[in-house]
Each structure stands twice: as C-alpha cells, then as structure tokens.
C-alpha cells in the first residue's frame, strides 16, 4: 500500500494508473476510521481495480474551531486498517498541501440551495467546505467511482448535484448505514460518548424507527409527529437539535406527490452531536 502526502506524487501515480487502463475508486474520509468506513472500502474494491482512500481533516468544513481542534487524528492506526483491507493508495496530505495560502482566500465550490438548507442552516459554511474539498479530490484522483455513506444523507445529495452540475464523469455510490447491534449508526463522533451515554445512544434510532412506523401506518400530521419525537428524545437524555421529514428525492417539504420520505434526526448527547436518517416509502 502506497501512502502519498504530496500533490505531485499523487498526480504521478494517477497518470500511471490511467496509462494502465485501471478503473479507480475513491473513498474520501477524514480519518479516525471505523467499520462503516471499511464498508465503503469494500464497496469500492468490488467495483474497481484500484482503491484510493483520502484521509484529510478538512478545516474548511468545520463551523466551530473547537470541533476542528478536537477531531481525532489517527493516521497510523487508519493506515494499518486500510493495509489489512488491501487498499492500494492512501492520500494523506497536510493542510498546507491542500490550502497553501489558507482557506480564507481559497477558491471554493458552493452548491446553491442544498448547502444552506437543513443541516447547512445550522452549520454555516460546512457544505461549502465539503463540496470544495470533494471537487478538489475529484480533480486530483480522477476516479471512475466515488463511495459515500448514506448516513450523511444531505451530503450525499449535495455531492450528486455537484457532480451533475459540474459535469464530473464519476459514478457516485451511496453505501447504506452500518449500525452497531443495538442500532446506533457507526460514526467517528461516537468516540466522544462516555460509557453511560453510549448506553443511551441507541435511543436515537428507536425514535427514528418510531417516526418511520407512524408514516408507514399512514399518519401525515408531520408537525405532531416531529413534536412527539423531540419530546421522546429529550426524555431519553438527548437534546433534540433538528428533526425533519422531507421528500427523499428533493429534500424539499413532503407533498402529495412525494413517493419516498427521508427522516433526518440530529441530537446532542453530551458533547457529541449525533445524526441519523431513515427512508420510508409513502406509496
């Protein structure tokens, strides 16, 4: 497994792979890898000849400096996991390598609408940072496919729109959420939970599933469903942050013509902001 830290070396390797006619898959990450990331890697391996995993804690997508400062950097352990998975290439650049003149004056990519709604409304600049780094990685790696987790539902929708709008010739693969046995979605942020909070955490998925059951049973008073869910979360020990029921295809409000809904939930548990989602057929 090759570990590359500079743009010139990465370009050199990508040129070689292109000349050899290899099909390349990219898995963009911020490191601190868990089994959910490994599921992305496995999906990439099944679909391509060569798998490139990027590990970069992107300062442009953090709206709070303290979150950036405390985000775990575990490069050595990450590379050991990826080597066991027989990943071909790890791209682990420094911030200086990606943003030589800092982030303030760096050219950015913004996806109107999707970047400022829902999660974007409470985290200003976050999705601009995501679309900027992902488009830069697409330009550098030139992958045939790229794999993203469905846990970050809005991010996946944003990437799909950016790829369509910008004409990237890249297949975007959404990989289903990987969960612990008790239902908690795997996330790097789970590491912020205390042992006691970890016991409470599966309650998020239980509330999510309860909303889904109501929708599937034909209930359509969304305001009431959301209010009850928020109350349930708070009673379980969470601080409900945002609960949305949206059209799964547009992320707009659910309408009479909506075929599928996505339930998006964000809640604080101690110092960890946990997010999860679930799709529901409305037909």
From Swiss-Prot:
Its main location: cytoplasm. One of its GO terms (molecular function) is ATP binding. (R)-pantoate binds at residues 61, 155. It comes from the Bacteria. The active site is at 37 (proton donor). Gene3D superfamilies: HUPs (3.40.50.620), Pantoate-beta-alanine ligase, C-terminal domain (3.30.1300.10). It is found in: Cytoplasm. Keywords: ATP-binding, Cytoplasm, Ligase, Nucleotide-binding, Pantothenate biosynthesis. GO terms for cellular component: cytosol. ATP binds at residues 30-37, 149-152, 186-189. One of its GO terms (biological process) is pantothenate biosynthetic process. It catalyses: (R)-pantoate + beta-alanine + ATP = (R)-pantothenate + AMP + diphosphate + H(+). Homodimer. HAMAP family: PanC. Catalyzes the condensation of pantoate with beta-alanine in an ATP-dependent reaction via a pantoyl-adenylate intermediate. The reaction proceeds by a bi uni uni bi ping pong mechanism. Belongs to the pantothenate synthetase family. This is Pantothenate synthetase. The gene is panC.
């Amino acid at each position: 497994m090759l570990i590359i830290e500079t743009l010139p070396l990465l370009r050199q390797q990508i040129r070689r792979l292109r000349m050899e006619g290899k099909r390349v898959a990219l898995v963009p990450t911020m490191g601190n890898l868990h089994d959910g990331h490994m599921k992305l890697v496995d999906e990439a391996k099944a679909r391509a000849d060569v798998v490139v995993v990027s590990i970069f804690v992107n300062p442009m997508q953090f709206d709070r400096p303290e979150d950036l400062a405390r985000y775990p950097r575990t490069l050595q352990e990450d590379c050991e996991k990826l080597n066991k998975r027989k990943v071909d290439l790890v791209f682990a650049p420094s911030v200086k390598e990606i943003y030589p003149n800092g982030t303030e004056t760096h050219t950015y990519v913004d996806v109107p609408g999707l970047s400022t709604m829902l999660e974007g409304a409470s985290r200003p600049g976050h999705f601009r940072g995501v679309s900027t780094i992902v488009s830069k990685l697409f330009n550098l790696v030139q992958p045939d496919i790229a794999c993203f987790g469905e846990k970050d539902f809005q991010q996946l929708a944003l990437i799909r729109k950016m790829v369509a709008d910008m004409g990237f010739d890249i297949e975007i693969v959404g990989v289903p959420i990987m969960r612990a046995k008790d239902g908690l979605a795997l996330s790097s942020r789970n590491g912020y939970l205390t042992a006691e909070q970890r016991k409470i955490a599966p309650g998020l998925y239980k509330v999510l599933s309860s909303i889904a059951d109501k929708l599937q049973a034909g209930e359509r008073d969304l305001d009431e469903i959301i209010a009850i869910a928020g109350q349930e979360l708070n009673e379980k020990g969470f601080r409900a942050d945002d609960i949305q029921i949206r059209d799964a295809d547009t992320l707009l409000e659910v309408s009479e013509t909506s075929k599928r809904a996505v339930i998006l939930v964000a809640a604080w548990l101690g110092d960890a902001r946990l997010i999860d989602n679930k799709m529901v057929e409305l037909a």
